Every structure is written in structure tokens, then in C-alpha cells.
Amino acid sequence: MIDIPDALIATQSKYNGETGRAFLAALPGRAAEFLERWGLRPDGAALHGMCALVLPVVREADGRPAALKLQPVDEETAGEPVALRVWGEAGAGAVELLDHDPATGTMLLERLDSGRPLAGVADEREAVRVLAELLARLSSVPAPAGCGLRRLGDVVARMLEEAPGAVEALSDEAERRLLADCAAAVREVAGEPGDRVLHWDLHYGNVLAGGAADCGAALQDRERGPDREPGRGGWGAVDHRTADDRWVAIDPKPLVGDPGFELLPALVNRFDAAAVRWRFDLMTEALGLDRERERARAWTLGRLLQNGLWAVSDGERRLEPEQVEIARLLLGRG
């Protein structure tokens, strides 16, 4: 029998309503089912994020530490095992998928060290460099034909349909112009949405050091609050890395598209207005986008539009100040 954390109960009930409550009700039985089906034994206290429950386990057949991840299947999570398999075949640096049940979305993942996230690296430039290099590996992988992942072209089409109403809903005239300019920028590149497998939310908290010292490879949503924007927090005081560390990407919300759509989390997470330009330049260079910076800029403005649309849909009439500052800088108004 597992104990479901109160915080997971609260978030599932608040944000997913009846669907969330049904997921919670099924969790104890589902956990027991997969512990038995996949030959696993519990190996520590359960962890959770906004939507997932993660159980540290050991695979009895070979003694391998692993992480059993149970989460609802929705538009964002449905593609996670697909992307992990594609990246795994390419050796791109994502957490290894050991097993998966398509009917429930349950996954068995390699166990990483949640006590050593990239966010704990004190040297900001080194952390951005590691993130950029990992992102370059992930976004270099073409999406296989018929993979079923959601596509950036479809996402952007919906965004552009919603943009005029969202612009009108904002109470600040300058922010209305800013959001309209974000929409105009992404409209220019929407006709070529790209064909790479994107992580969508790769930032410092979604990169962990390899190793099974702790369960956490599958700990979801450490990066995003209810507003669905990348998380915040200060740089760690201690650099936890060793020379042998293998940095691994976790928690993708994958889609197929242009790598330029991947840059915003690295700009807004651990926000520093003075760092936006050099982070953007470093990221575009690492991803091979330095000759197409205008295109990367447009896609990043598209991500800002996406966040703005979500804010308005949540009832907000002002944009997040950090989002406004990044948009101003990318539009040359900072």
C-alpha cells in the first residue's frame, strides 16, 4: 500500500478536477499492479511533482535501481515515452526508458540523482553551457515518420488564432503591443515549423546527474508551477559536479518542431535581465542557430506568446514582468 502525498492530492484535485481525482483513486492499485508485473520492490519513500507519483524501486531480476513513474495521460505527457525511446536510440542524453505501459502511461525509468541537479552548479556560465550542449544533442534528432508526437505547426496555428483575443484582454497598452509583436514575429516563421524532437522545457532543474544515489529521474514538474511557466529560484551555492558526471535530461513535454522554440526556459529560469542576451547567444551558437538568430528570436517570442496566452486564459490581465523584460530585450527595446 502506498501513501499518496497530500500535496499531490491537492494539485490533482485543483487543476485536473474529476480526472485528477479518478487518477488518485486508481493510484494504489496501479502501483501494486506494476510492482508485481515488472518484478519491482520498493526502495524508499515516494516522491511527487505537480502531476506524477514516483516510487524508487529495485528491479528484482537484476538488482537494478529504477524509478516507477505514474502519471495521468494528457496532451503533454502522452509523448514522453515516444521521445525517450527516440532519444535513447540516438544516445542523445535523455533519461533511459526501461519499460512502458501505453494504456496507463506508467513508465519505468533509470534512477538518477535528484540531489544533484544542474541548478546546483554555482558557475552560471558553466550551467548554461552544459544545458546548451545537452539541448543541442536532443534537438538534433529528427522525428521519425508517424511517431505521433504533437507538432509545433499545429500548436502555433492555435496560438495565432487565440492571440487577438488575448491581446485585447490585457489591461496595459504597452503589454498589448508587446504581445501583438510576439504574435507577428512567430507568424513570420510559422510556415516552417521544423522536424526535430523537442524537449519543450529543458532548464537547470530538469537536468540531473547520472547515478542511482537517489530517486528522482522521473520527478515531474519541479520546473513549473500552476501557471505552466518554467520555474524560478537562485543559483545553488555549491557545484555538485564531479569529472565523471553524466548530465541527463528528464521530464520532457515533447513535440516536433524547430529547435529555436526550445530557448526560453534557459532565459526565464534563474532570471537575470543582464544575462538574457549572452545566454541567448550562447544557446544559439551551441545549437548551430547562430546564422539564424532572427529565426531563433522569432520562435522564442513565440514561446513568450504561448505563456501570455496561458496567463490570459488563467484570468490574468497583466503579463509576468520577467516575460515582458525578455520580450523587450529580444525586440530591441531593452
Residue ranges: model-predicted function:
Residues A209-A217, D221, R232-R293:
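Active-site Asp-x-Gly
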Residues L24, P28, R64-L138, A274:
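A conserved alpha-helical element in kinase catalytic cores
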Residues G205-V207:
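Hydrophobic residue at the +6 position relative to the catalytic HRD Asp in the kinase catalytic loop
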Residues L55, V95-D101, G194, R297:
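Conserved beta-strand elements flanking the ATP-binding pocket of the protein kinase catalytic core
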Residues F23-L35, S140-W200, G210-G211, D244-D245:
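An alpha-helical support segment within catalytic cores of ATP-dependent transferases
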